[in-house]
Amino acid sequence: MDTFKQISGRIAPMLEPNIDTDVIMPKQFLKGIDRQGLDKGVFFDRRFMAGGQPNPDFILNMPGWQSATFLLVGPNFGCGSSREHAVWGLKQLGVRGLIGSTFAGIFDDNCQRNGILTVSLDEPALARLAQLAASADTNSITVSLDRCEITTAEETISFVISELKRAMLAAGEDAIAWTLQYLPEIENFEVAHYSRRPWLKRPASPRG
């Protein structure tokens, strides 16, 4: 998983509330588990027209927002069914951060596990970012995870993130990789635990 320490890029506004995972990644793209080619499926029904041509009215197809690194999203982004493909697709599309007010819980967890930062801000800060994101001349920002700051051409906005989430994103590690760094302690605990309670390791007797 890629590390996240300080990243600069364009931010695209997608402020509609309750954008769910079916909008982010339609069901026809959920067949594979190899995480390949999912960038095509992201917002497919909005990015493309019926004939397959790019929709010129969709924000991520417009000049100045086509390669957005960050999305400024509406409340409850990522609601709906739990489908990690939605996060995989966003990551493959080049999205490294989502900034909004609230995120669906499981979707938020999936973002962390896959190296996408989610930042929750208050409404005044979001309104100021929305003004900047609306223009291709001012939609560049820098997000520092070390300082927990978003820097624009006009101001620096601080955000709050749990220390565990920040450390895992900065290290580029998911929950398994993060846990494995404590493997010696886990193994020592296991030895001590079963030495005090050896009956717990005995095979179960068959029921007759």
Curated annotation (Swiss-Prot):
Cell membrane in keyword set: no
Query: What domain of life?
Result: Bacteria
InterPro entries per the UniProt record, alphabetical: 3-IsopropMal_deHydase_ssu, Aconitase/3IPM_dehydase_swvl, AconitaseA/IPMdHydase_ssu_swvl, IPMI_Swivel, LeuD
Q: In which pathway does it act?
A: Amino-acid biosynthesis; L-leucine biosynthesis; L-leucine from 3-methyl-2-oxobutanoate: step 2/4
Q: Which CDD domains match?
A: IPMI_Swivel (cd01577)
Q: Is Transmembrane given among the entry's keywords?
A: no
Q: What is its EC number?
A: 4.2.1.33
Keywords carried by this UniProt record:
Amino-acid biosynthesis, Branched-chain amino acid biosynthesis, Leucine biosynthesis, Lyase
Q: What SUPFAM superfamilies does the annotation carry?
A: LeuD/IlvD-like
Q: Family per UniProt?
A: Belongs to the LeuD family. LeuD type 1 subfamily.
Q: What does this protein do?
A: Catalyzes the isomerization between 2-isopropylmalate and 3-isopropylmalate, via the formation of 2-isopropylmaleate.
| Self-association state and partner proteins as the record states | Heterodimer of LeuC and LeuD.
- Protein name, as recorded: 3-isopropylmalate dehydratase small subunit 2
Species of origin reads: Salmonella typhimurium (strain LT2 / SGSC1412 / ATCC 700720)
